[in-house]
From Swiss-Prot:
This is Nuclear transcription factor Y subunit A-4. GO terms for cellular component: CCAAT-binding factor complex; nucleus. Residues 131-156 bind DNA. Belongs to the NFYA/HAP2 subunit family. It comes from the Eukaryota. One of its GO terms (biological process) is regulation of timing of transition from vegetative to reproductive phase. Heterotrimeric transcription factor composed of three components, NF-YA, NF-YB and NF-YC. NF-YB and NF-YC must interact and dimerize for NF-YA association and DNA binding. It is found in: Nucleus. Residues 24-44 have a biased composition (Polar residues). It comes from Arabidopsis thaliana. Pfam families: CBFB_NFYA (PF02045). The gene is NFYA4. Residues 7-23, 156-166 have a biased composition (Basic and acidic residues).
Length: 198
């Protein structure tokens, strides 16, 4: 009996919803066209709630640290099969405040170097001090080179070019008349064509 009562009440509610006048559910169209051509879902749709993106970018992890971070939101799904990149492997270092991400090859290379250094220290072998520069002659040459603004090296071409421009400026005053006549003759020949006709 109770199931039949529920069915009757459900039918009455759905029938009451169907009996709403069209003015409440569809907007009036002043141009005389039928109002069925307008999509009512787009007019009355509610704004969509935006959720957290489950795959945060590892480079912005510190910026979005307040949000809950799950490295693998779907435990049964392998990210490699989905074509997504896995986040980098953080280094095991106490001095780093935030994790530094490297790829797998870099990580294994770092581990190999650490192991070899640990073996050398265990054998009490002194680690060679690195030279401050590779070649003494290059260092001495760099010391002798002239430097410009900001400590950068000056190019020899630019230095020679600057001196040549100054010399040319003084000599151009003396020969300005001769050069202007040569330029005008070259211009006249270029405009006249190969046979001397314009």
């Amino acid at each position: 009996m109770t199931s039949s009562v529920h069915e009757l009440s459900d039918n009455n509610e759905s029938h009451a919803k169907k009996e709403r006048p069209d003015s409440q559910t569809r907007p009036q169209v002043p141009s005389g066209r039928s109002s069925e051509s307008i999509d009512t879902n787009s007019v009355y749709s509610e704004p969509m709630a935006h959720g957290l993106y489950p795959y945060p970018d590892p480079y912005y992890r510190s910026v979005f640290a307040q949000q809950a971070y799950l490295p693998h939101p779907y435990p049964g799904v392998q990210l490699q099969l989905m074509g997504m990149q896995q986040p980098g492997v953080p280094l095991q270092c106490d001095a780093v405040e935030e994790p530094v991400f490297v790829n797998a090859k870099q990580y294994h290379g770092i581990l190999r170097r650490r192991q070899s250094r640990a073996k050398l220290e265990a054998r009490n072998r002194a680690i060679k001090a690195k030279k401050p520069y590779m070649h003494e002659s290059r260092h001495l040459h760099a010391i002798r080179r002239p430097r410009g603004c900001g400590g950068r090296f000056l190019n020899a071409k630019k230095e020679n070019g600057d001196h040549k421009e100054e010399e040319e400026a003084t000599s151009d005053e003396n020969t300005s008349e001769a050069s202007s006549s040569l330029r005008s003759e070259k211009l006249a020949m270029a405009t006249s064509g190969p046979n001397g006709r314009s």
